[in-house]
């Protein structure tokens, strides 16, 4: 009887040993890429930033780099909307790791039309397609830039959602494109909210887009899904001025510029974040704009209307 009990115990012990070995092998097979780990100083995984910086950078490149089928990293360009001149370029990508990415181009410094959006500074009633509540107001130039492309963007996005129905959407942009990205996110939520989900909105070097009522409404619609990113002493996110305009909640500050020293500041206009800087729009003793930190290295990828690589490159900086 004791011999039989010993056999049972040995069999159980053998089963447990084999099971533990199998579990260990599975655990060891899990990728340990550092970019996929959550950085406690960022609201989203680092890889989401590194990849979407490249998504945006490619919108600054010429027509050849913005032909559907172009690939970089694990992203494939599906749709390129707008000519980057009279209509700000918006690209729609599919990423194997992140899903659908919608990225908007910043100001084209060689385009009078593109630059004109930056000075249409009157707050106006938002377009009904944004789905904002009464009392919200938005910067006229950003809404004008968004509106010119939205019909074509929404049609292309509808096709993309049909092609990848289980994928979520990340919306992103830089500078003027960052402002457009907030409006694009609202329009996507309003038009496609019943068939798709916005995962994140990441706005690089974002100017303020709307009034405090706009910022509050945006926070309500996208709780915990948004962050702006400010590089060093970039002054663009400090405009247009408060109290008429206000950022939604959440801002990452890369400080010093182009470094791996960054921190997330929750809430609207956190006084410990980029709002604590004294901005310098011009080079000392001149009226020449200092665009320095507006372009540069964001989370290991390079981006800027004149400085970034073409075609875009994911990481490596």
UniProtKB/Swiss-Prot annotation:
The keyword Cell membrane does not apply. Pfam families: Lipase_3. Residues 1-29 form the signal peptide. Its EC number is 3.1.1.-. Disulfide bonds join 61-310. Its main location: secreted. It is found in: Secreted. One of its GO terms (molecular function) is metal ion binding. The active site is at residues 175, 234, 294. Keywords: Disulfide bond, Glycoprotein, Hydrolase, Lipid degradation, Lipid metabolism, Metal-binding, Secreted, Signal. Optimum temperature is 35 to 38 degrees Celsius. InterPro entries: AB_hydrolase_fold (IPR029058), Fungal_lipase-type (IPR002921), Sec_MonoDiacylglyc_Lipase (IPR051218). The keyword GTP-binding does not apply. Optimum pH is 7.0. It is an enzyme of class 3 (hydrolase). GO terms for biological process: lipid catabolic process. Induction: Transcript accumulation reached its highest level in 4 hour old cultures. GO terms for cellular component: extracellular region. It catalyses: a monoacylglycerol + H2O = glycerol + a fatty acid + H(+); a diacylglycerol + H2O = a monoacylglycerol + a fatty acid + H(+). Glycans are attached at residues 108, 194, 258. Belongs to the AB hydrolase superfamily. Lipase family. Class 3 subfamily. Secreted mono- and diacylglycerol lipase involved in plant virulence. Has a substrate preference for p-nitrophenyl esters with a carbon chain length of C10 (p-nitrophenyl caprate). This is Secreted mono- and diacylglycerol lipase 3. It comes from Gibberella zeae (strain ATCC MYA-4620 / CBS 123657 / FGSC 9075 / NRRL 31084 / PH-1) (Wheat head blight fungus). The gene is FGL3.
